[in-house]
Each structure stands twice: as structure tokens, then as C-alpha cells.
């Protein structure tokens, strides 16, 4: 019982934030386009996901020509593939 209490208290004190994967949206509600160049697109997305969004990394999903990010904070708004790629948020 004490162990459970310590674990719960630790999470509260650390304010653990959830993570998710997805196509992030910018401040205008648009996804990050990465184009058709595989090398440039993957480098751009990986850097943007790590630096701007504090994720683990990312790459260009060439099916949608949009950046996909791994392990980004839950607070980042992401695109659902049935929505328009630019949407007011």
C-alpha cells in the first residue's frame, strides 16, 4: 500500500505529461508539409519534431506529404486524416 501511495505521489509531483504520435499542426491549424524529396523531407521533419515540438523524432509520410512525429507531448494538436489539412484550431 505504501508503494502504491509513493508511485501516485511521484506522478503528481513530476506532473507527468502523456505522449502520442501523429501529424502535428502549426499555429494556423495546418499540417507541416514535407514535399516529395525523401532525404530533405525526412531531415526536415525529424528536426522539426525534435526541436520545435520536443518529440523523439519524425519523418516524412509520403502518402500524405506531411510530417509524422513520434512521442510528441499530448498538448500538440494533431491532424486526423479525415479532416482538412488546414483547419482553424
Swiss-Prot record:
Disulfide bonds join 30-86, 34-60, 45-67, 49-69. Pfam families: Toxin_3. Expressed by the venom gland. Keywords: Disulfide bond, Ion channel impairing toxin, Neurotoxin, Secreted, Signal, Toxin, Voltage-gated sodium channel impairing toxin. It is found in: Secreted. One of its GO terms (molecular function) is toxin activity. Residues 20-87 form the LCN-type CS-alpha/beta domain. One of its GO terms (cellular component) is extracellular region. Residues 1-18 form the signal peptide. InterPro entries: LCN-type_CS_alpha_beta_dom, Scorpion_toxin-like_sf, Scorpion_toxinL/defensin. Belongs to the long (4 C-C) scorpion toxin superfamily. Sodium channel inhibitor family. Has the structural arrangement of an alpha-helix connected to antiparallel beta-sheets by disulfide bonds (CS-alpha/beta). Inhibits voltage-gated sodium channels (Nav). This is Sodium channel toxin To13. It comes from Tityus obscurus.
Amino acid at each position: 500500500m505504501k508503494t502504491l501511495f509513493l508511485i501516485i505521489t511521484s506522478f503528481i509531483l513530476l506532473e507527468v505529461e502523456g505522449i502520442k504520435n501523429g501529424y502535428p499542426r502549426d499555429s494556423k491549424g495546418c499540417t507541416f508539409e514535407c514535399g516529395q524529396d525523401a532525404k530533405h523531407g525526412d531531415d526536415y521533419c525529424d528536426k522539426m519534431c525534435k526541436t520545435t515540438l520536443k518529440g523523439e523524432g519524425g519523418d516524412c509520410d509520403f502518402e500524405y506529404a506531411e510530417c509524422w512525429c513520434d512521442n510528441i507531448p499530448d498538448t500538440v494538436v494533431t491532424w486526423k486524416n479525415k479532416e482538412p489539412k488546414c483547419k482553424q484550431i
